[in-house]
Amino acid sequence: MLYNLLLPYIHNSHIANLFHYITFRSGLAVLVTLSLSFLIGPRLIKFLQTLQKYGQPIRLDGPESHQAKAGTPTMGGIMIILSSCFSTLLLADLTNKYIWITLFGFVSFGIIGFLDDYAKVTKNNHYGVKGKSKLLLQGIISLIVCILLEYTIDSPSHMLNVPFFKSLSMDLGYLYIFFAIFVIVGASNAVNLTDGLDGLATVPIALTAGSFALISYLVGNLIYSNYLQLTYLPNTGELTIFCASIVGSCLGFLWFNAQPAEVFMGDTGSLSLGGVLGIISVITKHEIVLGIVGGLFVIETISVIMQVYYFKATKGKRIFKMAPLHHHFEKSGWTESKVVIRFWIISLIFVLIGLSSLKLR
């Protein structure tokens, strides 16, 4: 909004000219979302405590230490969604189609998560919306996003770029739409599975969003994309501001979500954040890189898949003491804080590997 309002004065005012730079608006986006999170956080938490009689339902078969979390309110993802959307609408170019498509997906996945959280807190169990129903809704939203990208963006690409290789890419044709849906839905659920401990998912999400802030900026810049031999995608640079907003809102949320958590992001936060990271990876044509920088989410998801299939195949035996993987380490005697910090370190390593693919090819 501010960019569009100040656009006529960019060449006449030094202050207005600052808003011409994506880097300036991105840095400002982090500060705005961080400040807004600090401002609305305490009020939102108090409201959620009043609204939710029992708070987030705690699994009885989980680690014993988790029973102390009973009564902690969920739906804290509302804070992330509100602050991120406000900052993006305030600082991004509102004529940019990518911004609106991304915001649509972000809010839509957040609504799915909200419905799931609402079902959990009203029924006082951890089941929520049925898995198949939730998956169907995610698929529909992802399909709508893909259709919007297909028919509202000039020259949509169906190419799948392979990182670490200069010219290795595959034209998937219209099969790319199904691949994109898989990426978006998969990312949404992967982040959701990872969000099981205080602060565990928040930092990896911020790191991944920060990575895609850089990627969006590079592929949206003709000079940098040519230098790094990346596919140039005009107008994607504005997504840098949205990604920066996610970073700021996650850091602000972490203030209240650090152990012992005052609030959980719930599916409202995890489904929306995972889904929008998937959407941005599709727009920037770095879907595989998302699987690398978000490697922690992939590992957590694989651990669940392995556990389920092995349990069914062996009629009751388990590979892990409990899935997702972070619960296995808790059951093995690691403290919650040790699991969280070590998983943050692992996430940072994956991010560095993923970002190295931008240059090493």
Curated annotation (Swiss-Prot):
It is an enzyme of class 2 (transferase). It comes from the Bacteria. Pathway: Cell wall biogenesis; peptidoglycan biosynthesis. The chain crosses the membrane at residues 28-48, 74-94, 99-119, 135-155, 167-187, 203-223, 236-256, 263-283, 288-308, 338-358. GO terms for molecular function: metal ion binding; phospho-N-acetylmuramoyl-pentapeptide-transferase activity; UDP-N-acetylmuramoyl-L-alanyl-D-glutamyl-meso-2,6-diaminopimelyl-D-alanyl-D-alanine:undecaprenyl-phosphate transferase activity. Its main location: membrane. It is a multi-pass membrane protein. GO terms for cellular component: plasma membrane. This is Phospho-N-acetylmuramoyl-pentapeptide-transferase. The keyword Cytoplasm does not apply. Belongs to the glycosyltransferase 4 family. MraY subfamily. It is found in: Cell inner membrane. Its EC number is 2.7.8.13. It comes from Rickettsia bellii (strain RML369-C). InterPro entries: Glycosyl_transferase_4, PNAcMuramoyl-5peptid_Trfase, PNAcMuramoyl-5peptid_Trfase_CS. Its cofactor is Mg(2+). It catalyses: UDP-N-acetyl-alpha-D-muramoyl-L-alanyl-gamma-D-glutamyl-meso-2,6-diaminopimeloyl-D-alanyl-D-alanine + di-trans,octa-cis-undecaprenyl phosphate = di-trans,octa-cis-undecaprenyl diphospho-N-acetyl-alpha-D-muramoyl-L-alanyl-D-glutamyl-meso-2,6-diaminopimeloyl-D-alanyl-D-alanine + UMP. GO terms for biological process: cell division; cell wall organization; peptidoglycan biosynthetic process; regulation of cell shape. Keywords: Cell cycle, Cell division, Cell inner membrane, Cell membrane, Cell shape, Cell wall biogenesis/degradation, Magnesium, Membrane, Metal-binding, Peptidoglycan synthesis, Transferase, Transmembrane, Transmembrane helix. Catalyzes the initial step of the lipid cycle reactions in the biosynthesis of the cell wall peptidoglycan: transfers peptidoglycan precursor phospho-MurNAc-pentapeptide from UDP-MurNAc-pentapeptide onto the lipid carrier undecaprenyl phosphate, yielding undecaprenyl-pyrophosphoryl-MurNAc-pentapeptide, known as lipid I.
